[in-house]
Amino acid sequence: TWHSVFTTWVFALCVRFGRLFGSDNLGCCLYMALQTGLLCYAVARSLSLMRRLGSSRRWQLAGMAFFCLTPIWGAYCIMLGKDTLFTATVLLWLVQTVEWARGLRRWGPGRWALYALTALLICLWRNNGLYLALPCLLVFALALARRGDRLRMGGVAAGVLAVMLAFDNLLVPALGIVDNRASGVYSLPFQ
């Protein structure tokens, strides 16, 4: 799919910051640093999760080797696009979900808000992110045994859906952003 409006805004913000110092390249470098930082953080959190789940040292080293020695991850960080931020956010969301499901962290209101923000970023980084986040959130909500957790997860799903509907149907059109090309209309259904 094409770049989402939100991803384009973040990239433009980085480039405009670089222009304050007379360099578009500085802005591109800032965007790459953002991608690299978020991906490194997500990978570190996933490796930490492996340790907390009791994975052997060998599996932890294999996980680290996969991310350190596979060339695609380094290339991902220097590629100016939407996929690196999306991938890092999905990985971070997966780590948060496992931590929640296994009871590895205490989940207060702040943690639920962070979980909702991560799910929302999945939807904002890519146009088709909603098709990943919303069904997962609904399945999680239905699978929960405790009523309080079910309501919280349902609230996260409803909140993400409401923000995305407002973003796509109110904010974006109000700003005059329109994609009337066939690629924009048909890219999501044909994926």
Predicted features, each with a name:
Residues 1, 131, 153-191:
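Juxtamembrane membrane-water interface segments immediately following transmembrane helices
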Residues 1-14, 22, 26:
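Extracytoplasmic catalytic/substrate-binding loops of multi-pass membrane glycan-assembly enzymes
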Residues 33-54, 88, 92, 96:
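Transmembrane-helix motifs of polytopic, lipid-linked glycan transferases
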Residues 57-61, 103-120, 150-155:
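Short hydrophobic alpha-helices at membrane interfaces in multi-pass membrane enzymes
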Residues 60-71, 95, 119, 123:
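Short helix- or helix-capping micro-motifs
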Residues 78-85, 125:
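Short acidic/glycine- and proline-prone juxtamembrane loop motifs at membrane-interface regions
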Residues 86-104, 115-119, 136-137:
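Specific aromatic-rich, kink-prone transmembrane helix
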Residues 111-126, 138, 159-164:
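Membrane-interface alpha helices of multi-pass inner-membrane proteins
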